[in-house]
Amino acid sequence: MTATAPVAQPKMSHREIMQSLTGLLMGMFVSILAGTVVSSSLPVIVSDLDGGQTAFTWVVTATLLATTISTPIWGKLADLGNRKLLLQLALAMFVLASAAAGFAQNTEFLIAMRVIQGLAGGGMGALSQIVMADILSPRERGKYMGLFGAVMAVGTVGGPLIGGFITDTINWRWNFFVALPFAVVAILLIQRTLHLPAFAKRKVKIDYLGIMLLSSGVALLLIWMSMGGSQFGWNSTTSYLMAGGSVVLLALFVLTEFKAAEPLLNLGLFKNRTFTFAVIASLAIGVSMFGTSVFLSQYMIMARGATATQAGLMTFPMMAGLLVISTIAGALITRFGKWKAFVVTGSILQVVGLFLLGTIHYDTNFVLVGVYMFILGAGVGLVMQNMVLVVQNAVPVNELGVASSAVNFFRTLGGTAGTAGLGALLAINIPNMIADRQSDLAKAMATLGDKAAEVSAQLASGSLPSISTLPEPVRVIFESVYGDGVAALFAVAAPISLITVVAVCLLPNQKLRTQTAVERHQEGEGQAPASAPAVDGAKGLEAQRAEGTLLTEAPATADGDNEKKPGSPAGA
């Protein structure tokens, strides 16, 4: 394969930047929508295709696996090749896979198309942020944070609502068609308005062994996390083999990266304090972002008797907090060029929000629950996107794709681990909590008369009870149990989020650049000559340090801000 060095192109106009940004945000929207729009209709889809519980699990897990595994690969390809072409390729893959999924006649074909959707989604999510760095400077990007929040809020909250409405009124197959117009418009907008520099070709080596080891190790790890406790016991031989196998594969990946000529993940990036602490923070953010959204929905359904659609609406305060606060903070970051106070405040709000959610019960005033969710959403909004921003601001421009995608990768990994771990804890706690309420349950059953036998059979079946259909005396007990059980998860997640507070406090307070990635490229920052031969990974790091092309920490002034490069434009 060939990689490239930039050749100067005319600057994009403000109108072209805004149109391209619209296309990028559409790409991000469809990648989010692909995962959320089917969530409320999956039982209908799997049943219609004559699938079982295994198929139900894999329809979800396959997309998660493909998205997570492909994210760092897309990031590396973005550093080696044509980013615009890669983004269009990801969008085209999504269009074809979504259209095909809508015509699925069995679960096997549906799962295969969901894998391709996941691969494309990983590309759209990673490449959108990388290309955004090409056309907007870190300083300028703050004022567009509200758009990110809006896309995330609409995609996350609106997806299940749209999917449920389509399934109820038309047909579940249209869930896979609904995002296609957005993807097609995104392709056209990007083709017409996104003008990135042409690149002079040079020979590079693809790290195929690294790709294979990382993909295998992460896949095994995510399958273990996603299915442990349900498909097999945590203390089983299968569990130990999967966990041990993933550790071995990932250890081999790390060893391989030291020797690779073009490593999939340049381990030298971990010498950059900003990158390292952003990765640590992102792991903990994943627990707050993904884990809490899953269990908040379960709280609404199991403890407050909401339907799946109602649960989506009831979690809107969290998305509203993310949208409103990230919009305000982004504008202030662009105006004043200061980011750290917002990020530290956000990390503290995450802990406060989780702690407050750890105090809720099944009958807590919903206004209070909404306030707690808003606080948590505000914290996530202040931290999550800014982690990508500060990393892109701090790393060498030729590692921007890898570094950006690594932050997303570790955030997803943290979210998956957090969801699996908290889910396992809930599965352990609920039976114990029900056992503690046996005397109350017996009294409630005694009031049911002829219905007692029917309710007893339902509870003894071992399946998750439909809380809303239970008689009120029994329903209140189960709502109380699930309310306290889910609240206990938030109480556990709160101290985990202290990791984010520590990590963001340790981030170097570097000044935001006023140059885009394209401008940095055109100045020759971080670029080896086009004719430079590939070098061995370990020796290559030393060579880059000697040549000054490996940036382990941005130059800093006495107050911790990085100095402005000569020739950098002033202002925002």
Whereabouts are the PLM-identified features?
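Helix-loop-helix hairpins in multi-pass membrane proteins, especially solute transporters
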Residues: 64, 71-210, 227, 320
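12-transmembrane solute porter fold
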Residues: 17-40, 53-62, 178, 209-211, ...
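Hydrophobic alpha-helical transmembrane and interfacial-helix anchor sites in secondary transporters
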Residues: 45, 77, 165-166, 332, ...
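Hydrophobic/small/kink-forming positions within alpha-helical transmembrane segments
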Residues: 65-69, 99, 157, 215, ...
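Transmembrane-helix exit segments and adjacent C-terminal regions of multi-pass membrane proteins
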Residues: 1-24, 274, 455-572
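A membrane-interface helix-boundary motif in multi-pass transporters
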Residues: 168-180, 227-239, 307, 428-494
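C-terminal membrane-cytosol helix-exit motif in multi-pass small-molecule transporters
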Residues: 180-199, 215-227, 245-259, 500-508
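Flexible interhelical linker loops that connect adjacent transmembrane helices
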Residues: 7-11, 139, 187-215, 230, ...
